[in-house]
Amino acid sequence: TIVIGFMSPHKYPERVKLMRERRITSFAMELIPRISRAQGMDALSSQAAVAGYKAAIMAADRSGRFFPMLTTAAGTIRPAKVLVIGAGVAGLQAIATARRLGAVVEAYDVRSATREQVESLGAKYIDTGVAAEGEGGYARELTEEEKRKQLEVLASHITRSDAVITTAAIPGKPSPKIISTEMVDNMKVGSIIIDLAAEGGGNCEVTRPGEEYDYGSVRIYGPFNVPSMLAVHASDMYAKNLLNFLTPVIEEGELKLDWEDQVIHDSALTHDGEIRHEPTRALVEGDAS
């Protein structure tokens, strides 16, 4: 038996253990390597794009303010100020969508290499002086000093924003806490936080994962499974990712797995009674450091 899909092995080690015991060959789509050849298979990116777009729409829908600038007989209305934290695929899509809606957008990411991408979308990049590029295009965890420096700079931008969208997540680890309770206390009346990192615990200290509620005068929403809210296109994109993964390994109607291929090697979770992904193996066998 072969299983392909999002496995979340760090969340469900017992599931991985069961697949190992039953000698199931499994491939985790979230383990697809970030290399040029595998871009069409990158389901994390395709679903993140859906989530980022939807986050901006949710922020605009729940905000008590217009996003674009309006000039009316009743006077001029200034555009909303939107802050996007995390400039990965989800963050960049949130920036682009908020800009299309007419908002003034600022963005921040610990990976300084994202500055050019942020500015190309018409947003202002916030430079905190902290750079934390990690492996595989992801951000690494910050030191305590880096966290302090980051929060000092971000605090003033957060309190001036009408909407904040957070997308900062580290695969297999809890989401970093970027927005403190004190920052939320100082936010504008009627402002909103959309926390896309809620499934990992959230980027905001007062996020209740899976819930939407008012914290004082600020609306906090930490949704789960955001891509399912745009099910048609999310499914189309995911199906294409799966097709692109399967096409190279199917010959004459049979599955031919080349374990020397980086995509196959890196995305394999279990095979032939073994856990092939080392961090997951360490977690399941109880010797994770």
Name each model-derived stretch.
Residues 1-30, 163-221:
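ADP-ribose/adenylate-binding Rossmann-like module
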Residues 30-73, 198, 204-289:
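Adenosine-phosphate binding glycine-rich loop
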Residues 16, 56, 94-95, 115, ...:
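Generic hydrophobic/aromatic pocket-lining and core-packing "Φ" positions
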Residues 9-13, 46-53, 92, 108, ...:
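Electropositive phosphate-/nucleotide-binding environments in soluble metabolic enzymes
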Residues 8-11, 31-33, 111, 130-133, ...:
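Short, acidic/turn-prone active-site loops that include or flank metal/cofactor-
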Residues 2-6, 38-50, 85, 101-105:
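Flexible, glycine/proline-enriched loop segments at strand-loop-helix junctions
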Residues 66-159:
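Glycine-rich phosphate/diphosphate-binding loop of Rossmann-like nucleotide-binding domains
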Residues 21-25, 60-68, 100-104, 119-126, ...:
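Generic secondary-structure signature for well-ordered alpha-helical cores
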